Every structure is written in structure tokens, then in C-alpha cells.
Amino acid sequence: IDGIENHRLKEAAKKYAGAFEQIAVADALLAKPQDYEDVAKALWESLKEEVGDFPLILMGHGTEHAADASYAMMEQSLRAYAKHEIYIATVEGSITIEDVIARMKSGLQSRQNGKVLLIPFMLVAGDHANNDMAGGMQDGEQPDADSFAGKLQAAGYQPECVIRGIGEYPAVREVYLAHLRQITQKLFCDLTTENRPGILYG
């Protein structure tokens, strides 16, 4: 998302704006409305056979930045494209796993128990995926009580964790590459004019 880290990247680029003819910064994965549709399609087409008929919960990082709203927008886009029961919960954002569990139990598609798939909505599956999401479950042990899997289990569900970052899906990588192609084309066009040195953003 276009959150804290991405804005730090842009600020860092500004410091060197005068040292190069041009600096180009491509868009984050979710920067424009079309990105949500593209990522929804890329993710669901990559996951649908694995998910089957079971509910899917994607674990995002979350942020105190206003871009935290991107997770709710991404969930809406996924549901609209997949026509499936999909949720996004975050580790450090406003949408918690408790919020999702409450929705699962009280919504129109309410499920009181049963299998639920947990998959990271992060580029790589690292510490958050292994600990905050799976809580040691991938090692054949009972999940930690404060992990996503542990809280789902305590609520009566049967969580199944997939330790795989979204960067492992070729269709998602293609969205990143499309952003790179866009900014490269923009950079080339800008360099053929008489523009002064500066920074180009996707």
C-alpha cells in the first residue's frame, strides 16, 4: 500500500533529486482504483483452486497511516471479483482478526465453525506470517493463543495456514511489472523533453 514506508521512500528520493538527471519512483501495488481490480483478479485466479468453497482470510500488515483504508477497499474488490467469502484482517491496522471473526459469525454468510484458510497479504511470508498468523501451527503444534490461527481455533474454526507471500504468484508480480513499465515509459518521455531534473512518480 502507499503507506508509511512508501512515503519514506519518496522522501529519501527527494534528498537526491539534484544529484541525478531524473529519479523515477513507481507506484505501490495498490495506488490507483484500477490496481485493486487488477490485484483482486491476480490473487483470486492464483488461489481459487486452493481455497475451494472455504472462507478465506488474508492477513495484511496494517498501519496507522491513512492508507490503512486500502485493506477494506481490497477486500471489497476481492469479494466483487471472486463472489466468495473473503476477509482481510491486519496485524497492526484498524481491522483486527476479532472483527473478522465477529463478521463471520453474524453476517449473511455466517459460519459458526469449519475450515478457514489463512493466507498472508504481504509480499513475502516472513515473521508476521509464521508467528502472528500461523503461531507455530505450521510445525505441527497447536497455534499460539494470540495468533490469528489461535484465535480462530478458540472461536470454533479449523484454520489452515498457507505460508506463501503474494510475491510468489506470477500474476501479482505482473501488476508490479506493469507499474514499472508505466514509470519507465514516463521517464523516457520526460527525458526526451527539456524538463529540468526532478522526480517522477508513477
Segments from the language model and where they lie:
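Extended amphipathic ligand-handling, pore-lining, and cofactor/metal-binding catalytic surfaces
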Residues: 1-202
